[in-house]
Amino acid sequence: MDYEKIGFKAGLEIHQQLDTHKLFCKCQSAIKEDGNYSFGRFLRPTQSELGDVDKAALAEAKKNRYFLYTASDESTCLVEADEEPPHAANSEAIDICLTTAVLMNATLVDEIHFMRKIVIDGSNTGGFQRTALIAVGGKIDDVGIQIIALEEDAARKIEEKGRIVNYGLDRLGIPLIEIATGPDIKNPNHVKEIAERIGLLLRATGKTKRGLGTIRQDLNVSISKGERVEIKGIQSLSSLSKVAEKEVLRQIGLINIKEILKERIEKKDLEDIKLVDISSYLKDSKSNIVQKLLKEGCAKAFRLPGFKGLLKLNDTKLGKEFAVQANIITGIGGIIHSDELPGYGIEQKEVDELRAILQLKDNDALVIALGKENTVVNALKIVIEIAKKVIDGVPNEVRRALPDDTTEFMRPMPGAARMYPETDVQPIRVTKDHIDRIKNNLPEEPIEKHKRFMREYLINDEQTKQILSSGYEIDFEKLVKQFPEQKNVIIRTFLNTFSELEKEKIDTNVVDEKMLINIFSALTADKYSKEAIPEILKYLILNPKSSIEDAIKTCGLYATDSNKI
């Protein structure tokens, strides 16, 4: 595809956890699966400084959800519960952000002011997230950096059952650096390249966390006839380019649908749509789904002018979009459209009867909702509103990345009414002395480090990239200095053993400096042979409380005494 021709533009937002204590208290920033207390609350939208209410917050409030919070004394205090004012901002986290900004040649702010960003999806107990602008401007290669910010991470979602959502507070308050690029990214492959460059620069500070969930990437994508769409929660580098490609196809598909609808209908045709109760017509249906949902209430439907054949197209899947958005806001589970009928046990004769009742024309579709009457009515009204947006083309919205690299609706695009000043945290002056101290202690630039690794460790360009992108370069250098006679074994472990274990779905992110030192200390002491490293490493990852001696003994990997051979 010619991405320049279609006017492709993309910008990245990288959110990276910093390896320090929490942002507004001294609690450790470690994930604790088990909590020892819990509490719950409802959250409601508040007005901004100018008296406006953010539309994204309003959409969230309509879901009327109850939030249950699970916490541990080891990783949370009253600050996370929003029962105590925030303490002074974490100075180490601020310095990491300032260091990153200097490395990117960004312009630092004179004074750091924290703001409150309204978030009432339950991921923040106070109904807002604290965030502060650190720097503006800067560049990564040919891509501009718009902002560098410091913010607190959100709570970790544990489960969602109906209208009750359970969050863990262990993650809430972990410092995050946010780096947002300009819309200068030229194609999907370029997206991945820039994300890699930013990742290397962040790891150069030596103060970022590693592992699943410690870095999250949001992507803003638009094409010339489309709209800016923000895609949140892309977990891996490999998914970035695929998500961008599929979003382009989705937007092209929506633009094509817009053109088809222009030929079939006028906007006014969607203005006076009537809901029709079809419960009596489906009461004898052989469909198990229909019978189950009818017991909860009723079935209603409406004629959707001009949409026949447009609801199940591969790249857009409008029918699924109707169902997802209606479910997010109302909780409804039963939305059916005519492009997937006959189906779900609904037979062709029933479809024909419904088409006649609703007086469908050749190009018309029908949409059915089943369940409690109030829920059904609200859900169908939402579907009608979505259809009205589709006739205008690509909606400007926030979407969620899915495991197959497609996306689904998440919420409307937030506006300026989302932000207001944080009055509980004092402004922080960024003095010349402070900046000089940062500049005098800058880490090694990634490009220089790359050259040095190739020169010092006699490894090639691709091997160097692999080690530097793993996040283990600091451990690697420490091990080579401590065990110089094992240099080749250490290199082989980082280049081959780690990737082999990852292919077995073994999480190598739990490997730390202490574990590696114990492994190579025992090897140097001839307690086992170097061929056993993969098995020992695997055992210690799966049994993190075990010692190196336990691993050697359990795996039966004692080195053979050459004198006994």
Residues covered by each model-derived region:
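Basic, nucleic-acid-interacting segments
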Residues: 1-435
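C-terminal accessory/binding modules appended to enzymatic or scaffolding proteins
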Residues: 449-452, 459-461, 558-565
